[in-house]
Amino acid sequence: MLRSRRLALLCLATPLWLAACASVTPTRGFDASETAASQLYTGRFSANYVRYGRNEGVQGSFRWQEQGRNVRLDLVSPLGQTLAIVTATPSGATLDLPNEAPRNAPEVDSLMEQALGFSLPVSGMRDWLHGRAAPGTPSNVTRDANGRPDTLRQSGWTVRYLAWQDTPENATPTTTLPRRIDMARDGNESPLSVRLVIDPENKE
């Protein structure tokens, strides 16, 4: 119980989370060349990781908006304060934090790791949120009795699909969307586990 309370209040225990009461405005927009339909996912997240040899944890809600290969990810504390806004496009990534100058990098994963101490695998999540492996990268997928992904291993991550959204009877494995996803980074050097619980009303 004590550990759970510490994790729930972690967002108030470090300078980053204390600064979250300030408003955060994303500085990078989506690439204008993208014409694909926009998709929106919202839900809750939790992450457990090791930083400076100590076990850490954070949780809150997220808002994931994608258009083609463009992604904007908002992380919000349990108190409703913006923790970070991540914008990733084919041309680069930007991380906006409260009361700090925007940080830019060619890709988003290492940018989050350096600034936050943990990194959601945004590059892979573009496809994993749809219940599929990312194209162009080796993967290993096991499926359940309904043909839906059960475990997906790709890019140094193990992704487990633990629950699926309620769907019409005529839904197929390619149209069903995940409800709960557990992700763990492979290896022991920098342990990181992430849980996503996706709201059922998400839609394209």
Swiss-Prot record:
<keyword id="KW-0998">Cell outer membrane</keyword>
<keyword id="KW-0472">Membrane</keyword>
<feature type="signal peptide">
    <location>
        <begin position="1"/>
        <end position="20"/>
    </location>
</feature>
<keyword id="KW-0653">Protein transport</keyword>
<keyword id="KW-0143">Chaperone</keyword>
<dbReference type="InterPro" id="IPR029046">
    <property type="entry name" value="LolA/LolB/LppX"/>
</dbReference>
<dbReference type="Pfam" id="PF03550">
    <property type="entry name" value="LolB"/>
</dbReference>
<feature type="lipid moiety-binding region" description="N-palmitoyl cysteine">
    <location>
        <position position="21"/>
    </location>
</feature>
<keyword id="KW-0449">Lipoprotein</keyword>
<feature type="region of interest" description="Disordered">
    <location>
        <begin position="131"/>
        <end position="150"/>
    </location>
</feature>
<dbReference type="InterPro" id="IPR004565">
    <property type="entry name" value="OM_lipoprot_LolB"/>
</dbReference>
<protein>
    <recommendedName>
        <fullName>Outer-membrane lipoprotein LolB</fullName>
    </recommendedName>
</protein>
<keyword id="KW-0732">Signal</keyword>
<comment type="similarity">
    <text>Belongs to the LolB family.</text>
</comment>
<keyword id="KW-0813">Transport</keyword>
<keyword id="KW-0564">Palmitate</keyword>
<dbReference type="GO" id="GO:0044874">
    <property type="term" value="P:lipoprotein localization to outer membrane"/>
</dbReference>
<comment type="function">
    <text>Plays a critical role in the incorporation of lipoproteins in the outer membrane after they are released by the LolA protein.</text>
</comment>
<dbReference type="GO" id="GO:0015031">
    <property type="term" value="P:protein transport"/>
</dbReference>
<comment type="subunit">
    <text>Monomer.</text>
</comment>
<feature type="lipid moiety-binding region" description="S-diacylglycerol cysteine">
    <location>
        <position position="21"/>
    </location>
</feature>
<dbReference type="GO" id="GO:0009279">
    <property type="term" value="C:cell outer membrane"/>
</dbReference>
